[in-house]
UniProtKB/Swiss-Prot annotation:
It is a peripheral membrane protein. It comes from the Bacteria. CDD domains: ABC_Iron-Siderophores_B12_Hemin. Belongs to the ABC transporter superfamily. Heme (hemin) importer (TC 3.A.1.14.5) family. This is Hemin import ATP-binding protein HmuV. GO terms for molecular function: ATP binding; ATP hydrolysis activity. The keyword ATP-binding applies. The complex is composed of two ATP-binding proteins (HmuV), two transmembrane proteins (HmuU) and a solute-binding protein (HmuT).
Length: 259
C-alpha cells in the first residue's frame, strides 16, 4: 500500500498541498481527479519521491524518505506528464532504460519489444524517439515504466504512478492504456493515475480521490464520489451525473467499447 498522512508541500514559498491524507491499495486502480491547479500532479510527484514534503509517506510500510532511489525504483515506476530528450535515441533504447532502473525480467532480451507490443507500438523499436508524434512518445514512455515493474508483484506489490497517461492519446489508445492499468492491478500491483476525463475515470477506476485547492476533499468508489453537488462545487460549473444533453447533440461514452 502507498499511504500518505498529513502531507504538506510548498513550492517557491507557496503552499500547494495542505494536510492531505491519501491511500492507494494494491489490486485496484486509484484515480486522482480535480480541476487545473488543484494539486493532482504535485500529489503524484510527491508520493513518487520527486518533491520534498512534510508529513509521512510509506511505500509497502517503508518510509519513502528513508528509501534509497534504487530501492524505490524496485517498487514503483513513474510516468511523468511529459518527457523531453535532448539527444537522439531509438525507441528501444528509451524503453530499455526501464530494465536498467528496475529488476524485472532483466534477462529477457525481448522485453522492450513485448512492452512496445503491449502499448500498440509493435515494430517501432528501431525508430528514433524524436521522430514520433506526441501520443506515440507518451506510449513509448509507458512501455519504459512497464519494463521497470513488468512483474506486478515480486514478494510485495509494485506500483505504476501515472501522471495524465492518456492526455495525448486518441480514444482507442486511451482505452488500451487504461486496460493495461486494470490488468496490472488485477495481477496484484497498484496503480495511481491522474485523469481529467471523468467518464474514463468512472469506467476504469476502482477508487477515486478528488482534489480541490490543494486538499483531498473526497475519496471512495466512483459511485460514492461522483455526485452532482460535489462535482459542481469542485469544478465550478453546473454538472449532472448521468444526465443526457438536451436536444439532438451526439455524445460518446468509452463504456460502449468495453461491452
Amino acid at each position: 500500500m502507498i499511504e500518505a498522512r498529513d502531507l504538506n508541500v510548498s513550492i517557491g514559498g507557496k503552499r500547494i498541498l495542505s494536510h492531505v491524507n491519501f491511500a492507494a491499495e494494491p489490486g485496484i486502480v486509484t484515480a486522482i481527479v480535480g480541476p487545473n491547479g488543484s494539486g493532482k500532479s504535485t500529489l503524484i510527484k510527491t508520493i513518487s519521491g520527486d518533491l520534498p514534503y512534510g508529513g509521512s509517506i510509506t511505500l509497502n510500510g517503508q518510509e519513502l524518505a528513508r528509501m534509497k532511489p534504487a530501492e524505490a525504483a524496485m517498487v514503483r515506476a513513474v510516468l511523468p506528464q511529459s518527457t523531453t530528450l535532448s539527444f537522439p535515441c531509438t525507441v528501444r533504447e528509451v524503453v530499455s532504460l526501464g530494465i536498467m532502473r528496475g529488476y524485472s525480467a532483466a534477462r529477457d532480451n525481448c522485453l522492450p519489444e513485448r512492452a512496445l507490443e503491449k502499448v500498440d507500438l509493435a515494430g517501432f523499436a528501431g525508430r528514433f524517439y524524436q521522430e514520433l508524434s506526441g501520443g506515440e512518445q507518451q506510449r513509448v514512455q509507458l512501455a519504459r515504466v512497464l519494463c521497470q515493474v513488468w512483474t506486478p508483484c515480486l514478494g510485495q506489490p509494485r506500483y505504476l504512478l501515472l501522471d495524465e497517461p492518456v492526455s495525448s492519446l486518441d480514444i482507442k489508445h486511451q482505452l488500451i492504456v487504461l486496460r493495461i492499468a486494470r490488468e496490472f492491478a488485477a495481477a496484484g500491483g497498484g496503480v495511481v493515475a491522474v485523469l481529467h476525463d471523468l467518464n474514463l475515470t468512472v469506467a476504469f477506476a476502482h477508487h477515486v480521490v478528488i482534489m480541490h485547492q490543494g486538499r483531498s476533499v473526497a475519496g471512495g468508489t466512483p459511485e460514492e464520489v461522483m455526485q452532482d453537488a460535489l462535482l459542481s462545487e469542485v469544478f465550478d460549473c453546473q454538472l449532472k451525473v448521468g444526465a443526457l444533453p438536451d436536444g439532438p447533440t451526439p455524445f460518446l461514452l468509452p463504456q460502449t467499447a468495453m461491452v
